[in-house]
């Protein structure tokens, strides 16, 4: 039922390991999401960039989205392999040119170095300065609110007094 001219080959979206995962667990997880392909027969496996051995990886269930399918696969890399590049290989009958689609992933060490987190508040003095600034702003707004309430009371009193004076003169 698919149009012959429609591109129904797998469209990959890749996700790289987080810095927190690599630092905390000493592993990194590459995720490859394959979307908008038809039919649902697909094979996904992982290899090192310069290797031929198929690595142990995991796959999610096949999901149907509208008239196409979606599948995801992930590879968890141990610390000893973080310096190696990896590739996700996709076999599908509608791949462009009929060849296997290869998605390359950079080394985890490159990812960890290029996404080094920055710390905004490195010093306790900075935290105290921030707390002082917030407290000052709070009291400033509180003072302005109090001033506005007093101003409202004075204006209301003046208008009510003026109205009562005007009304009393007309009755006389």
UniProtKB/Swiss-Prot annotation:
Compartments where found: Membrane
Membrane spanning stretches: 141-160
InterPro entries hit by this protein: Ig-like_dom, Ig-like_dom_sf, Ig-like_fold, Ig_C1-set, TRG_var/const_region
Spans within the Cytoplasmic topological domain: 161-172
Name by which UniProt lists this protein: T-cell receptor gamma chain C region C7.5
GO annotations of cellular component type: external side of plasma membrane
Region (C region) residue spans: 1-140
Topology of the protein relative to the lipid bilayer: Single-pass membrane protein
PANTHER family: T CELL RECEPTOR GAMMA CONSTANT 1-RELATED, T-CELL RECEPTOR GAMMA CHAIN
Keywords: Immunoglobulin domain, Membrane, Receptor, Transmembrane, Transmembrane helix
């Amino acid at each position: 039922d698919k149009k012959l001219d429609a591109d129904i080959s797998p469209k990959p979206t890749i996700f790289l390991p987080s810095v927190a995962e690599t630092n905390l667990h000493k592993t990194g997880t590459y995720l490859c999401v394959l979307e908008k392909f038809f039919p649902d027969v697909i094979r996904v496996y992982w290899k090192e960039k310069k290797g031929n051995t198929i690595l142990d990886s995991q796959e999610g269930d096949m999901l149907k989205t509208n008239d196409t399918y979606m599948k995801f696969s992930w590879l968890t890399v141990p610390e000893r392999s973080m310096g190696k590049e990896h590739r996700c290989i996709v076999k599908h009958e509608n791949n462009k040119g009929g060849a296997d689609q290869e998605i390359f992933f950079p080394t985890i060490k490159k990812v960890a170095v290029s996404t080094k987190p920055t710390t905004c508040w490195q010093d306790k003095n900075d935290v105290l300065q921030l707390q002082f600034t917030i407290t000052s702003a709070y009291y400033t707004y509180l003072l302005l609110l109090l001033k506005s309430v007093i101003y409202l009371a004075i204006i209301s009193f003046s208008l009510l007094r003026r109205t009562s004076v005007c009304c009393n003169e007309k009755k006389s």
